[in-house]
Curated annotation (Swiss-Prot):
NCBIfam families per record: PRK00521.2-5
Organism, scientific name: Dinoroseobacter shibae (strain DSM 16493 / NCIMB 14021 / DFL 12)
Keywords: Cytoplasm, Ribosome biogenesis
UniProt subcellular location: Cytoplasm
Function: One of several proteins that assist in the late maturation steps of the functional core of the 30S ribosomal subunit. Associates with free 30S ribosomal subunits (but not with 30S subunits that are part of 70S ribosomes or polysomes). Required for efficient processing of 16S rRNA. May interact with the 5'-terminal helix region of 16S rRNA.
GO BP term (any one): maturation of SSU-rRNA
Gene Ontology annotations for the cellular component aspect, listed alphabetically: cytosol
Entry superkingdom: Bacteria
Protein name as annotated: Ribosome-binding factor A
Protein family membership: Belongs to the RbfA family.
Pfam families named among the record's database cross-references: RBFA
PANTHER family: RIBOSOME-BINDING FACTOR A, CHLOROPLASTIC-RELATED
Coiled coil: none
Amino acid sequence: MARSRFDTGSGPSQRQLRVGELIRRTLSSVLNQGDIHDPDLNRMSITVGEVRTSPDLKVATAYVLPLGGHGAQDALDALRRNRHELRRAVSKELTLKFSPELRFQIDETFDRMDETRRLLSQDHVRQDLDKPDED
């Protein structure tokens, strides 16, 4: 298969990013409206932070976190239990050749940002950052 001259080979393609964002919006909408027939899932307020798709768009991994960050494992279990119904809801909204298999992961972005802030606020790191450039 020939590669596009615009493809650098690193990172997701524009199509992957676009489809991932469409799936993210659709999942968020379905979860907010409570269209899923699971009372446990409908009681939770879940944030869909990002959706990454495989290059062939057949697998979509949604990074989710319940509001407040509490009960993350319960939310993940409920989403995994209802993944087939969520997949049907996504495929009803989007016009894709294949309905992607949905996988769910806990979104750790906020934890990583907090850790980065903590590291950057340490005294020995701060003094290195505050040094004037010698160029």
